[in-house]
Design a protein with these regions (language model features):
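Single conserved hydrophobic/aromatic residue that forms the stacking wall/gate
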Residues: 1-9, 311-315
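Sec-dependent bacterial lipoprotein signal peptides
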Residues: 7-26
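Bacterial lipoprotein signal-peptidase II cleavage site
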Residues: 26-37
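Low-complexity, Pro/Thr/Ser/Glu-rich flexible segments characteristic
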Residues: 37-49
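Beta-rich interaction/scaffold domains
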Residues: 46-108
Length: 315
């Protein structure tokens, strides 16, 4: 019996020792796994930090040119911003966020920039028709709308050289940085005209009315007046502002008829009367302005009334 109990005791000791070894080995394995997981998380965090750092650097470069007035560093900064963007991964591009910067600055598809002609070449001649627009960074719209106006003016005035200028440097910088297309601002366009020996200059704005942009345009052009034999600045689309809210003119009448006809056509009615009979009203909306020219909206509303556009309104 003594030997039997001893054998049992020995077996228990052996089993307990084996269990302790297994537990010890299991514990060692758990620590190793925990260490591996920790290293993996550290690497992931480090990678995320690196991604954000790269994105932040691009955001700084975009912010630097976003609202920058043109200077001797603009060209290089536009180039550097785009090159830095191109080096980012798709995931890093989504992280770009600054005061003004976001992924759309370089990442949004607005059409083929090569379809747009910036009209910034020399060999102008003595007569120039300078078409001045606020501008847009949407390539397809710029080519079709602004480019369409420029082309129409060139066809109508074959003896004149048509050139382009934008008043919004924020747009000029954006297009140059993203697409490599250089568009003249007002000073660049006027300096180009002087350099090319232009004698007769006609400035045709595509602006809607006598607002802040138009005021700045006329101020800039007037500062160059003594460099040309003659300078003429055309009225904006809605013509002169007028004395009060009831003042209307031929320009406003032409615009009222044109936009009404287009609205009726787009709504697929045969006539304005047909739209009225169908209880359809048209509402035309403007951007609005704090400039004194805001009265132009009231004048356009007044313009609708004499031609029986009773179901047309401008809010």
């Amino acid at each position: 019996r003594s030997r039997g109990l001893g054998d049992v005791y020995k077996r228990q000791v052996v089993l307990l020792s084996a269990a302790m070894c297994v537990a010890a080995l299991g514990g060692c394995g758990s620590k190793a796994g925990s260490s591996s997981d920790s290293s993996k998380k550290t690497a992931e965090n480090s990678s995320k930090e690196d991604d954000q750092k790269a994105a932040d650097e691009v955001a700084k470069k975009i912010d630097a040119i976003y609202v920058q007035e043109r200077n001797d560093k603009t060209d290089e900064q536009c180039k550097e911003a785009k090159e830095a963007w191109d080096k980012l991964t798709d995931a890093q591009k989504e992280l770009v966020e600054g005061e003004n910067a976001d992924p759309d600055y370089f990442g949004r598809d607005t059409g083929d920039a090569s379809q747009d002609d910036p009209l910034n070449e020399d060999n102008i001649g003595e007569k120039e028709l300078l078409v001045v627009s606020f501008g847009t960074s949407f390539n397809a719209s710029r080519a079709a709308d602004i480019g369409g106006v420029e082309k129409a003016l060139q066809v109508a005035n074959p003896d004149w050289s048509v050139r382009r200028a934008f008043t919004a440097q924020i747009i000029i910088n954006h297009v140059q940085a993203r697409d490599g297309e250089k568009i003249d601002n007002m000073d660049q366009a006027l300096e180009r005209a002087v350099k090319n020996g232009v004698k007769k200059l006609v400035v045709q704005p595509t602006h809607l009315m006598h607002g802040a942009e138009y005021d700045e345009l006329t101020e800039t052009v007037n500062s160059y007046k003594d460099k040309f034999e003659s300078v003429k600045i055309a009225e904006p689309l809605l013509g002169e502002v007028g004395a009060d809210a009831t003042a209307i003119n031929e320009d406003k009448a032409a615009v009222a008829k044109a936009i009404t006809a287009e609205a009726v056509k787009t709504a697929e009615y045969d006539s304005l009367d047909a739209a009225a009979e169908d209880s359809t009203a048209f509402v035309f909306m403007g951007h609005g302005t704090s400039h004194t020219a805001k009265i132009s909206y009231s004048q356009m509303q007044a313009q609708m009334e004499p031609v029986s556009y009773t179901h047309l309104t401008l809010p």
